[in-house]
Design a protein with these regions (language model features):
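N-terminal, helix-rich and Lys/Arg-enriched segments in bacterial and organellar proteins
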Residues: 27-29, 60, 105
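Interdomain/boundary linker segments immediately adjacent to catalytic/signaling cores
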Residues: 1-41
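Short, well-structured beta-strand/strand-turn elements
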Residues: 50-63
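Conserved catalytic cores of phosphodiester-cleaving nucleases, focusing on short active-site segments
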Residues: 65-76
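Short, Φ-rich (hydrophobic/aromatic) sequence segments
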Residues: 5-11, 47, 97-105
Length: 105
């Protein structure tokens, strides 16, 4: 299962930069948790648009991605600690994403 290909990574990189620019342009201060949720949503969309057979339901009660019927969850963190909500312990596959923001973001 290869859901994170070069097209997905490039799409995520570009859209994350655009979103962070919007935050800055409008003077929005986001917490790491907010940014993690937004990056997760951008990754869901990037996978859905670039991987055949991938669907991003965008509903909390569903997995982040369904890939040919298989549940895939996305976890994002600005650090090394992984937290999750009500549905974070679903069986299935997981994609773990860590990120670091710097002055270029």
């Amino acid at each position: 299962m290869n859901l994170v290909n070069e097209a997905v990574i490039e799409n995520l990189r570009e859209n994350t930069k655009r979103l962070l620019d919007v935050y800055e342009d409008f003077g929005l201060n986001k917490t790491p948790k907010n940014i993690s949720e937004d990056i997760s949503g951008l990754l869901e969309t990037a996978i859905e648009r670039n991987v055949e057979g991938a669907i991003a339901p965008k509903v909390d009660s569903e997995p982040d991605i369904r890939y040919n019927g298989t549940a895939v969850e996305i976890k994002t963190s600005a650090g090394t600690n992984w937290r999750g909500g009500t549905f974070s312990k679903r069986p299935g596959y997981y994609i773990f994403v860590t990120y670091e923001l710097d002055e270029n973001n």
